Amino acid sequence: MRILFIHQNFPGQFKHLAAALAKRGHEVKALAITPRAELPGVQVMKYAVPGKNGPSTHPWLLDLETKTIRAEHCARKLLELQRCGYTPDVVVGHPGWGETLLVKDVWPEAAFLAFLELFYREDSLFDPEFAVRSFEQAARIRMKNAAFLVTLDAMDWGLSPTSWQAAHFPPEHRERISVIFDGVDTAAVRPAKDAWIHLEKKQKRLSRENEVITFVNRNLEPYRGYHRFMRALPRILELRPNAEVVLVGGDGVSYGAPCPNGTWKETFLNEVKDRLDLSRVHFVGRVPYPLFLNLLQISSCHVYLTVPFVLSWSLIEAMSAGCVVVGSRTAPVMEVVEDGKNGLLVDFFDTDELTSRVVEVLSSRERFASLGLAARRTVEQHYALSKCLPKQLELVESMPKRRKTSPSTRAL
């Protein structure tokens, strides 16, 4: 079959899937704005988005206009391919940035599989500390979903990584959404007793012999519970005088609102730094993937906190590495972590409970080691690439049969 992937930063979530389809003999192409990697057997094409938002655009429509601009330029590239005689059998695309809005208008006969990562809800209201409820906010969120609603109407089938994510899409579309996780390479992300890292700034070498608390996010921000973790740290370090804390993440914002003054990282560090032994707190920023894996492999306790939002890959990777996870008792985490079985869960807002759980794990590492082993088994059984990739391949290869009998009217 001819299969076309569309992702602004290809390969993104499609790294293993696209390469595997090419290996199986399919003709695989990909379209991106800024490709991040080359894959064997996959022809990657680029397109440009020169347009920008107009000066008089209604603020509630800025997101939709941005996505429409991307959709236009992506569609023009698709039309160019069409004029050259190319028509895919299957299009697999991430609609989150708008590129796929007009796919079915260019190729109504192609089967369109949409990667459905997030349907916007008022998750910002979860944490009262940052909740700002207003009619304007609700209207903005509703309008942000406008592009997704167009995609849901046009797609032949959807793919979501978790049940929690799939359940957030409108009920009338859920029967056309398959839940298959992206997949973690458990052969690469695995426990390693001899792992170690070197912290250059403070000239420290850490291994599994040390008490190491890990906290990982793309950016250190409230959506991922950074403020809750920082407020627990002074007491944790007081009770565990030999513990070292390593925080991975940038200073920016991936989700939610930006910090009104400076960065969230500095704001919540400043709140507690007078009560911290900063010689044992290590902010390492964003790190190369091999170093990230080594860090997970030496972790004595991995803390993962999040509001009800898309689950981070890093949690599944931590479990695959055999970490003892202390996670927030929020729905996305509870889909993966079962309290007392393959990790520990705490109330997102309860600083004392978080503190006591982390201290308990560090105080009795041998007793809690079984949770890390169980976490690894959970990933091997349900989230491993070896389990997920065959299901993804089967879904893509079945897409011509899943095409809706009445494709949308061609508009271009």
Task: For every predicted segment, state its role.
Residues 307:
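Aromatic "clamp/platform" in nucleotide-sugar-dependent glycosyltransferases that forms part
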Residues 142-198:
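A short, active-site helix/loop in glycosyltransferases that binds the activated sugar's phosphate group
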Residues 324-327:
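Short hydrophobic beta-strand element within catalytic cores of glycosyltransferases
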Residues 159, 200-224, 230-235, 245-248:
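Conserved donor-binding/catalytic core segment of Leloir-type glycosyltransferases
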Residues 353, 360, 367-382, 388-394:
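A short, well-ordered alpha-helix in the C-terminal region of glycosyltransferases
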Residues 339-340, 344-351, 360-365:
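Conserved acidic donor-binding segment of nucleotide-sugar-dependent glycosyltransferases
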Residues 51-61, 109-146, 187-196, 207-208, ...:
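Acceptor-binding helix/loop patch of EC 2.4 sugar-transfer enzymes
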Residues 253, 259-286:
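Nucleotide-activated donor-binding/catalytic signature segment of Leloir-type glycosyltransferases, i.e.
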